[in-house]
């Protein structure tokens, strides 16, 4: 089990991947490793998992992530930091001088990229729509079958269930539905 997790503090500290193994029904002998690579931690964990299988080192590897970069430090005693005068992450004098008036988050970064490359809301909706279409077509054509290990468990209602597909793909995505989604910030893309 390889999980990405930026700034491991609070509930996600102490090697979250190992804790996930110990919290599961896996044998204690299953290793768990956490990767901290800032915004790319979860993606890196998945790459490491793929490489382990491709190299023949491992037969089955679970790769994933638990980070929410915009909320770092998750679980930290933020109030204590405020009381000590530390403020928010990225709240240094150098950052304030370099980027006056900007509050950093993933959403701010996305808006800056969209602005730099003149991407409109419509451009991004079209990209998202096509991405879901491609993923849905690949799923229906069974392209992902060799990459997904079916996992059994209980769903939210407590009924036994088998997860055999990526649940993030929206098979019913449409441009109208995407256009109806609110932006994270007023006037954003």
Say what each PLM segment does:
Residues 60-113:
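Flexible glycine-/small-residue-enriched beta->alpha junction loops
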Residues 1-3:
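Membrane-embedded alpha-helical segments and adjacent helix-loop junctions characteristic
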Residues 93-94, 115, 186-189:
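Flexible glycine/proline-enriched surface loops and loop-helix/loop-strand junctions
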Residues 37-67, 114-143:
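Active-site-proximal alpha-helical scaffold in enzymes
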Residues 123-189:
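N-terminal extracellular/periplasmic Venus flytrap/periplasmic-binding protein-like
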Residues 5-59, 100-108, 172-189:
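Conserved catalytic cysteine-centered active-site region
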Residues 18, 111, 136:
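Short glycine-/small-residue-rich flexible loop motifs, especially phosphate/cofactor-binding loops
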Residues 12-13, 71-74, 155:
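Short glycine-/acidic-enriched loop or helix-start segments at secondary-structure transitions
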């Amino acid at each position: 089990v390889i999980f990405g997790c930026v700034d491991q503090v609070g509930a996600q500290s102490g090697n979250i991947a190992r804790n996930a193994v110990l919290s599961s029904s896996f044998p204690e002998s299953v290793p768990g490793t956490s990767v901290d690579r800032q915004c790319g931690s979860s993606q890196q964990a998945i790459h490491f998992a793929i490489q382990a299988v491709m190299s023949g080192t491992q037969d089955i590897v679970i790769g994933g992530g638990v980070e929410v970069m915009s909320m770092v430090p998750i679980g930290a005693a933020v109030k204590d930091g405020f009381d000590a005068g530390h403020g928010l992450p990225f709240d240094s004098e150098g950052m304030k001088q370099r980027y006056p008036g900007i509050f950093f988050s993933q959403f701010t970064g996305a808006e800056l990229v969209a602005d730099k490359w003149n991407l409109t809301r419509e451009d991004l909706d079209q990209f998202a729509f096509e991405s879901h279409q491609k993923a849905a077509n690949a799923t229906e054509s069974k392209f992902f079958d060799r990459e997904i290990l079916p996992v059994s468990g209980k769903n939210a209602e407590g009924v036994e269930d088998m997860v055999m597909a990526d649940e993030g793909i929206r098979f019913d995505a449409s441009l109208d539905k995407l256009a109806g989604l609110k932006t994270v910030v007023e006037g954003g893309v």
